[in-house]
Amino acid sequence: MDTHAFKRSLHHSERYNRRGFGRAEEVAENLEQAYQSGLIGTIRDNGYKLTHGRLNVHLAEAFGFCWGVERAVAMAYETRRHYPSERLWITNEIIHNPSVNDHLREMDVLFIPVEEGVKDFSGVTSGDVVILPAFGATVQEMQLLNERGCHIVDTTCPWVSKVWNTVEKHKKHTFTSVIHGKVKHEETLATSSFAGTYLVVLDLEEAQIVVDYILGKGDREAFMQRFAKACSEGFDPDRDLERLGVANQTTMLKSETEEIGRMFERTMLSKYGPADLNEHFLAYNTICDATQERQDAMFSLVDEPLDLLVVIGGFNSSNTTHLQEIAVSRGIRSFHIDTPDRIDETTNSIEHKPLSEDLKRDQVFLPAGPVTVGITSGASTPDRAVEAVIEKLMRLSEN
């Protein structure tokens, strides 16, 4: 399928909208009440620090809603205002934040049901309005909705669209797209649908397995077993690892994406030589600015003397998880929570999700005596949620 031609055709359809409806002022107050915070603005103005008795709060200097998320949420609110009585669907969570998605449900936005990991579009009919979330949607989903006669409101983050353009360039020039991402993440599913031949690698370990195979050190059967669900149909590692282009899920750890790119560049240079490198390796920068800014701010935050650190964001949020990884790598006592409700003020305990583990509850969350708490949040977390966490910390510190 010529995905580039399909996108171009869809963008010219009268039933497609990716620019909003000119109702920003009408929904501004709703958005401000639901997501913004005066306290957070005050803390920003005070050098990202707050002192309250024995409590010192240090905020990361970049956190919370990114521009792409703000745009997607605002467009969803505008869509409901523009279509007050039409049946309104969304193909997935608008962003990985439970409170934001709950607000959409309260606005009678229907979420496409999922049965055993497969989306069920049978309830969507001609004339329905369907929102594509910030992560985007697969080209097959777009095609289905277009053929069904739906009105499509596309809130896909422009940074995600940039990655789609990159893998389409790989496809055009017969390069295999090596995508650094999580194979089941909505964004990676969408990106791979625009690619031709592709392979998804999760981390440096998987990238090294691919590098070893390229250099003749791997076993074909073991390789195919490892990547059976992370590659394009008919993928042949002996044929499809000769010409590579690197792309990424925009929320992955920046330093890891860069290192994976360097690994493949060095490998192709070693195998084919400098004269032919450009025939075997393509590099594009698809790292999201907002992701990079939040990770850089987190690295600065963990350099400060902190007693503990709270990371706020959806448990299925990739960018939030990577912020938590940075804290863990520094040995800081840290807690990943998805909502302020995870903090129990009556018992001074916190329910949180350690990396790659199930939820657990820790007692004596806020220690006695002077305490410095670092706080950051993922790109899908509104300031209002961060404010609620800080207010709980303030009350706990008074006891």
Swiss-Prot record:
Binding positions for isopentenyl diphosphate per the UniProt entry: 96, 185, 317-319, 380
CC cofactor note: Binds 1 [4Fe-4S] cluster per subunit.
EC number(s) reported in the record: 1.17.7.4
Residue sites binding dimethylallyl diphosphate per the record: 96, 185, 317-319, 380
InterPro entries: LytB/IspH (IPR003451)
Catalytic activity: isopentenyl diphosphate + 2 oxidized [2Fe-2S]-[ferredoxin] + H2O = (2E)-4-hydroxy-3-methylbut-2-enyl diphosphate + 2 reduced [2Fe-2S]-[ferredoxin] + 2 H(+); dimethylallyl diphosphate + 2 oxidized [2Fe-2S]-[ferredoxin] + H2O = (2E)-4-hydroxy-3-methylbut-2-enyl diphosphate + 2 reduced [2Fe-2S]-[ferredoxin] + 2 H(+)
Superkingdom of this protein's organism: Bacteria
Pathway field: Isoprenoid biosynthesis; dimethylallyl diphosphate biosynthesis; dimethylallyl diphosphate from (2E)-4-hydroxy-3-methylbutenyl diphosphate: step 1/1; Isoprenoid biosynthesis; isopentenyl diphosphate biosynthesis via DXP pathway; isopentenyl diphosphate from 1-deoxy-D-xylulose 5-phosphate: step 6/6
Cofactor(s) for this UniProt protein: [4Fe-4S] cluster
Active-site residues (renumbered): 187
Gene3D superfamilies: 3.40.50.11270, 4-hydroxy-3-methylbut-2-enyl diphosphate reductase, catalytic domain
Keywords: 4Fe-4S, Iron, Iron-sulfur, Isoprene biosynthesis, Metal-binding, Oxidoreductase
Annotated GO MF terms: 4 iron, 4 sulfur cluster binding; 4-hydroxy-3-methylbut-2-enyl diphosphate reductase activity; metal ion binding
Gene Ontology biological-process annotations: dimethylallyl diphosphate biosynthetic process; isopentenyl diphosphate biosynthetic process, methylerythritol 4-phosphate pathway; terpenoid biosynthetic process
Residues that hold (2E)-4-hydroxy-3-methylbut-2-enyl diphosphate according to the record: 96, 185, 250, 317-319, 380
Binding locations of [4Fe-4S] cluster: 66, 157, 288
A Pfam entry, by short name: LYTB
UniProt similarity note: Belongs to the IspH family.
Function: Catalyzes the conversion of 1-hydroxy-2-methyl-2-(E)-butenyl 4-diphosphate (HMBPP) into a mixture of isopentenyl diphosphate (IPP) and dimethylallyl diphosphate (DMAPP). Acts in the terminal step of the DOXP/MEP pathway for isoprenoid precursor biosynthesis.
Name the record gives this protein: 4-hydroxy-3-methylbut-2-enyl diphosphate reductase
Organism expressing this protein natively: Synechococcus sp. (strain CC9902)
Lineage, broadest ranks: Bacteria, Bacillati, Cyanobacteriota, Cyanophyceae, Synechococcales
